Structure formats: structure tokens, C-alpha cells
Amino acid sequence: MSESTTAKPTKKLYIQTHGCQMNEYDSSRMRDLLGASHDMVPTDNPEEADVLLVNTCSIREKAQEKLFHQLGRWKHLKEAKPDLVIGVGGCVASQEGDAISKRAPFVDLIFGPQTLHRLPEMIETPRENGAVVVDISFPEIEKFDNLPEPEADGATAFVSVMEGCSKYCTFCVVPYTRGEEVSRPAVDVLREVTHLASQGVREVNLLGQNVNAYRDDSSGEVIDLAELIAAVADIDGIDRIRFTTSHPMEFTESLIQAYAEIPELVSHLHLPVQSGSDRILSAMKRGHTCLEYKSKLRKIRALRPDISFSSDFIIGFPGETEADFAATMKLIEDIGFDNSFSFIYSPRPGTPAADLPDDTPEQVKKDRLKILQTRIIQQAQEISRRMVGNTERVLVTGYSKKDPGQLSGRTENNRVVNFRCNQPELIGKFADILIEEALPNSLRGVLLGSELDD
């Protein structure tokens, strides 16, 4: 009589991700890692998960409270299922590890951005004397050596090329939560991109907190971001390259020249400036003036007249006057930004700016933010209207969120385009779309042709 065997039930993983694209990338690598080590499958329902992870961001105000609200919602799940594993990762974990373990003692794991590769071992580590497992150290970028090959999810992918930041802007916590700048060896980056391309990825976004500070000298020769982009462009299957997020100080002449020499580099750039006032830029310790910033963008636009620019703005930094804000608005007009991530300044504990006196009334900050965001929306709509009548090359990424009868994709300048089509095999391919209508948050067009016609 043969022995019957019962397969172990598949364990399920739920990850809540807060914050930036680096966190999105890290969360995807956690899924790959625990899928490889524990055969875990992702779920969108936290109530059916065996492992709950929250990947946190500490950039904005109330990040800690957002985390504890999330953990409060999960506490009852832990009470109903004692074997449930709850973990906190990301930048808030790096910054507030002790506070998390004290306020939420039911949390099992606390890990930083540089130690996520140790998750399989942390999950298996039994709690000793009721203590949480904590690993928020900054090992020298070893996590990439311990992660499995990435699994592609569609035609676009993020690829982290460096970690950390060494600029120490007075408002920013990143150097304290992710550590100093460390670049991955170019050969490792190219291997990852090649693997993704073999799975059908057509567009990669090279990531780093200060990505244009990328420097790899592991082979004896220095490879900068411009050279890395050129090497990525040579990989079969890769047709579009983006990079995020940049610092104006590190925007070298070779990187500017890449816009003339590398057609795969898209005609869109996100380059944070934070303020148009030299006085505020100095107080932020940004290391450049407004004129120096504009000069770089004008050089790029001379090489790529159709390029679009987006940026980050902090409103109400301590001491910001009406004149400072007016300088920011003038910069917005001069450049013609068509998108922004703009927020009212919130002091981050442990940063130099947190000690500066803040005497600007809250309502004034809110009014300034509304003025800035309204103008950038107007500029974006003007750019979208100018695109009507153009034929745009669109990378089709899936179905429209609002209409399953339409496919959706993005232009080089990061516009969402929806068009009616009954060819699902077009997903992951490039299509030529005649833009017929500009809507507030997207464009609508008709299909003229695609790679399927070749």
C-alpha cells in the first residue's frame, strides 16, 4: 500500500507599499525573494495572507502615524491568526525601529532597505523572550548579491542601479535612512536588464535616490550614468530608457550629451529643484543656483526640443517669503514644467532644517501650494492640447482602467494614451496612435499601426 502525501498549502504574501519608485522596486524584489525561498504567492487580500509586510516611506509628514494606523488595522488579524508574520520595512523602519517595537509589540520583523535580502532568515528566526527581530543595518549593497533573478511584470520594469544619497540636503532624511551613495557594478545592472528583456520588457527605469551620481569603478575604469545608459541601450529588446531621481549638481555634460546620442533615452526628464529662490536653495544646501538649474535644462532642450520636464517643489520651507515663492513661480513659467510632486514642507526629525524657525502661517502655505499646482496643471493641459493631431509612438501596457474596450499605454513624454482596440496581443508592443483628444489626465487616440503589422 503506497503512502499518501499531503502537499503543504501555499503560503500567501501581502505587501503594502508607501512612497517612491525605489520602494516599489524593493517590494517587487521582496515578492521575488520570498517566492523563491518559501514558494509564497502574492495576494491582494491581507486577511488571507500568512505574511504581512509594509514597506514604509519617511519623506512626508505623518509617515509614522500612517504606519501605526496600518499596523492597528492588522493587529486584529494577528489576534485571530497567531502564526501570522507581520513585518515593517523601508525608511521608517530604519529611522524608528525602537519606536515601532514599543508601540506595536505584535510586529515580528523590522528591517531596513539594505537588509531586505535577509527576509527568508528573519521569517524563520524564532522570537526569543518575545523580542522582535530587528535588522536595520547598512551592509555595503550586498542585498543585490543575494536576490533571485527578477520576474518581469509587463513591458516596463524598474532596475535599481544605486542606493543612498550623500548630498545631505537640510530637509531630507534619505542619507540617514538609506545610507551613503553606493553604486552597483555595471555588469550586474546589465545582467538584470538582459534578464528582464528576455521576458519581454521593452522599457526600463534606472533607479536611485540620486541616480545621476552613479559611478562604478569595480572594473578599474569609471563608468558613469551616461555610459551605463549607452550600455543598456545596446541590449536587444530594450527600446526605452528612463532614470529617476536626479540631482542638478550631478547632471554632467556627458549626461546632457546622451540626449543627442542615445535615441532610446526618452524625451522626458524628472529633475527635482525644490525652489526657484537662490536664498532658499542655499538654506536647503542644494549646492546650485536657480540659473545653474535652468542652464542645464536649456542645454537639454536644445538637443531635444520636444522634451518635457517635471520636478519636485517644497512649499513653505522655513523663512520662505512672498519674494521667494514668486521666484519659484517664475522658474515654473520659464521652464514650462508639465508635472510636479509638490508638498508643503514638513520637518523631518533629525534633519538640520527641523531646527529652523517656521513663522509662515499654515494657510499661506496652503494658498501658495494651490497656486503652484494650479499653474502646473494648466501648463500640462496646454502641452497635451498641442499634442492633438500628432502621431505618437506608444508602448501599450494594458487595458484602460475605465474602459476594458480600450487599450492603454504611455508616450515618451509620459502621457497616458487610451485607444479603442480589440487586439490584446498588442500589449507589450509599440503602436502608432493619432492623438484626437486631450483629457485632463490622459490623451485619447486611434490606432494607425503597430509592430504587429511588420
From Swiss-Prot:
Q: Which residues form the MTTase N-terminal domain?
A: 11-128
Q: For [4Fe-4S] cluster 2, which residues are the binding ones?
A: 165, 169, 172
Q: Which reaction does it catalyse?
A: N(6)-dimethylallyladenosine(37) in tRNA + (sulfur carrier)-SH + AH2 + 2 S-adenosyl-L-methionine = 2-methylsulfanyl-N(6)-dimethylallyladenosine(37) in tRNA + (sulfur carrier)-H + 5'-deoxyadenosine + L-methionine + A + S-adenosyl-L-homocysteine + 2 H(+)
Q: Which cofactor does it need?
A: [4Fe-4S] cluster
Its family remark reads: Belongs to the methylthiotransferase family. MiaB subfamily.
Q: Does the keyword S-adenosyl-L-methionine apply?
A: yes
List residues binding [4Fe-4S] cluster 1.
20, 57, 91
Q: What Enzyme Commission number does this protein have?
A: 2.8.4.3
How is the cofactor bound, in the record's words? Answer: Binds 2 [4Fe-4S] clusters. One cluster is coordinated with 3 cysteines and an exchangeable S-adenosyl-L-methionine.
What is the designated name of this protein? tRNA-2-methylthio-N(6)-dimethylallyladenosine synthase
